Structures are given as C-alpha cells and as structure tokens.
Amino acid sequence: MLTNMSLFNEKKLISFWHDNKELLFYFTRRVRREQIQVVAGYLSYVCLMSLVPLIVVMLSVMTAFPLFAELQQSIEQFVYQNFVPAAGDVVQQYLTGFVANASKMSAVAISFLFLAALLLISSIDNTFNKIWRVTDKRRTITSFAMYWMVLTLGPILVGASIALSSYLVSIVAVDEYDVLGLSDMFLRMLPLLSSIIAFIILYIAVPNKAVPFRFALSGAIVAGVLFELAKKAFALYITAFPSYQVIYGALATIPIIFLWVYVSWIIVLTGALITVSLQEYEILKEKKVKESDRAQVKDEEIS
C-alpha cells in the first residue's frame, strides 16, 4: 500500500515538473533579470526614509474621523502585531509619539510629510511598472491624483476593513456560532487572509496594465504564506538569538526594522514576479499555439 502511494506521489511530482518546468525556468530568468535583491535594498532605503511620514500622515487622516479615531488603538495593535514581528511594541511607541507631534506641526512641515510619503508611493509605482514592462506611463496629474487618493482614502478603507474584521471576529467568537472550533481557526487565519487581500490589491491596482485576478491571486497566496512564515521565523530568531542586542545595545531596533523591511520587500517582489511570470507565460503559450497553427495550415496548403 505504501509502495503504491509512493509511486503515485512520484508520478504526480514528475507530471508536475514536466508540465511546469518551462514556467519555473521563465520565472527564474525573470528573478535574475530584475535583480530583486538590489531592488529590495533600494525600496528598503526609500521605505525607511518615507515610512514614518507615510504612517504619520495616514494615522493623522484616520484620527480626523470620529469612528476611526476610536478604533485607532486597535488598528495600530493589529498592524504592528501582524506586520512588524517582535519589534512592534517599540515601533508603536515611537510612531504614537510622532503622530502626537504631527498635530503640533505647521502647514509647511505637514506638506513635507506628504511629499515624503508620496516619494515612497511613487517608488513602489515605478518599480512595479518596470517589473510589468509598462511602456505607457500614467500622466503626471493622474499619478499625483492616485497617490493622493492612497494617502487620503487609504486610511479610511483600512479603518473600515479592520472595523469589519473586528465585527466578524466578535460574531464568530460567540459560543453559539462557534462550531467545531471555527472561531479559533478564523482568528488564526485572519492575518494570512489580510496579507493575501493586501497583496491582491497591490498586484492589480499598482501596475498600469491589466492584471488578471487569477494570476494576482496566485502571486498573493505565495507572498502571503511566505510573509507569515517569515514573521514566525523572524520572531523566533529575535527571541532565540538575542546577540544583536549585545552588539547594538540601545540601537538594536534600527537593524531589526531594516532587516525586516528588506525581507518584506523580497517577499512582495517575489509575489509580483510570480504574477507577471504567469501572465507573460500564458501570452507566450498562446503565441506558440498560433504559430503552430499557422505552420500547420501552410504545410496543408503546400501538400
């Protein structure tokens, strides 16, 4: 029985490799060509320079709405616990102070915060369009309007989605709705689902090119799973190997955040390359089929 199962699994692996080896080779070539480790380093640098202004601006916009102002603390805890492993408490403490200070800033200083936040969004936009090989770039006015919508409507949508998630969690957590421990399963899956949804939106909305949902979903699932695994591995490393604290002392938070941002961008770009590889490979297959059909028609005409 075990022998038959092993033979069956081996045949499935061989069949999977035979069916997808060309796609895997194409994906590998794209990864090498795009040099994602270099691009991730560039985005990490821009992110560290612009992330604090971006978060300060978005949280400031969110606090302008009474409903989201009440949810701000729970929203911050959700983001830091699920997207900044191990160092979330320290980061939250600093950013809370930054947001409080932002309310005392002048209009000129706040405008510079907006410009720094726009720099990060613009860098992400340019990087994704380069990966998708977009030739028709958006007009400057269109790009600025889109970036402005991200800064203003983005916090509202994030707040609404987390409020909805909190409502669903409260419903599922009620004993009468808890069937076969589904509430615990839902709570465990919520960070992964949130990551996948965020990646889907990123891969579809950012490139100035039509991206089929099924390809964005495939890339988002891989990126989401890698992101969750990376969070657990990163938290394990920080708790089990605290040697970085001995080396850096009070500055230990800085390399931790930089390393995590770099790993996060590697994962984001990997998911993007999976999405674009699936999209481009399907186009190449369609071209090959059409060329084969044309060659067959020519052979029939000659014969």
UniProtKB/Swiss-Prot annotation:
Where does it primarily localize? membrane
Q: Which residues cross the membrane?
A: 48-68, 105-125, 144-164, 186-206, 210-230, 254-274
Database matches in InterPro entries: UPF0761_bac, Virul_fac_BrkB
Q: Which GO terms describe its cellular component?
A: plasma membrane
Q: How does it sit in the membrane?
A: Multi-pass membrane protein
Is the keyword Transmembrane assigned to this protein?
yes
Please indicate if the UniProt record lists Cell membrane as a keyword: yes
Q: Which UniProt keywords apply?
A: Cell inner membrane, Cell membrane, Membrane, Transmembrane, Transmembrane helix
Which Pfam family name is an example for this entry? Virul_fac_BrkB
Q: Name where it's found.
A: Cell inner membrane
Instruction: List the HAMAP family.
Output: UPF0761
> According to its UniProt record, which protein family does this protein belong to?
Belongs to the UPF0761 family.
What is the protein named?
Answer: UPF0761 membrane protein CPS_0609
Organism listed in the record: Colwellia psychrerythraea (strain 34H / ATCC BAA-681) (Vibrio psychroerythus)
